[in-house]
Amino acid sequence: MMAPIMPRCMKRLLIVSDPPAAPGYLPRVRSLCEYFVQKGYEVTLLTEEYGDLAFAHSYPIETIRMYSGSTFDWFIKTVWTLLTDWHNRAFAKKAIYNLQSAISNYDLVLCSAFSDFPLGAARRIAKGLKMPLYCDIRDLDEQVEDSTYQYHHRTWWTMPFRRLYRAIHIRRRNKVLRAADAITTVSPWHVDFIRPFNPNVSVVYNGYDAAQFYPKNIKTNRFIITYIGSLFEWQKPALHKVQQIAQELGIAIDLHTPQNHPIAHDALGDAIRRSGIMLVLTSERTHGMLTTKFYEALGCEKPILCVPSDKGSLAELIAYTNAGIATDDVEYIKTFIRERFEEWQQNGFTRQATQHRESFAREAQYDQYYSTHI
């Protein structure tokens, strides 16, 4: 069954998301909002109040405060949410009250989320106002064993409750997935996982911002392998392997994580273009995790070394785009690094002969789906 095609007169979208927090400020959500604005839609982003919204935007943002800021308030409301889904219920109620008559003028609710919040709130808003609900699922608990990607930031004393929280969250999430009119998500693995709950699911890859991530030959006096992004426990074995190989070859690895040597968002493009190789770390324990840095390196046509191969969506995309290699084989890794080092010695830069690159620009990805479905 195909996803329902909305009338072409639809112009007013209420986009609901979790808070756009630093440092990235939810690039997928922001780019979706800007895409629809550029296409002539009236867009309002509805989200929870959480710090400063320190990014440029051409659409109104409505924020709702849910917590007072005290630890006690957070604890009580977290427990109450576990028992009653307070977070989603209260957010929806406040949203309808705050927006009042304006909220009924929207034609569709589009909710982008990585967790069960604000999926439940968006469902309540759409159901109460009799509007279609589209869900954009950025992450799933099941994509990493034990949900270590989802809950790595939780404090130590919450760990014993993680299994219970996860089970409740998944049940609430799946209830919304079944009710959605259409769903988009980030990889073929995610599509296959969601399809039993709702057949109207399609992949819209995260892609890259073509205005920031584009090919440009920049000569450097140093060949480096660059890693940019968060570093989780399940990625560290792969990192240690590459570090040992690079050390044997006398090549440096520059690590840029949110905690150590972070790179400002507007400087990411040049940082990638100055790299000899972009390192992507994954694990066979993960499913469908297509890191944004893969797309950004693809946009800049920089060679990608993915260690190990996830033997799934990421390895398939790297092969499809000829963006580099995905492997755990030490000799393949050494050969790949040596070849790129020799290319740098000859030219002063590296450049990957990619394929299908333009189709993974964000606007191209959004056009492929939303131009016919909204």
Predicted regions located by residue number:
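Carbohydrate-associated surface elements
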Residues: V186-W189, G207
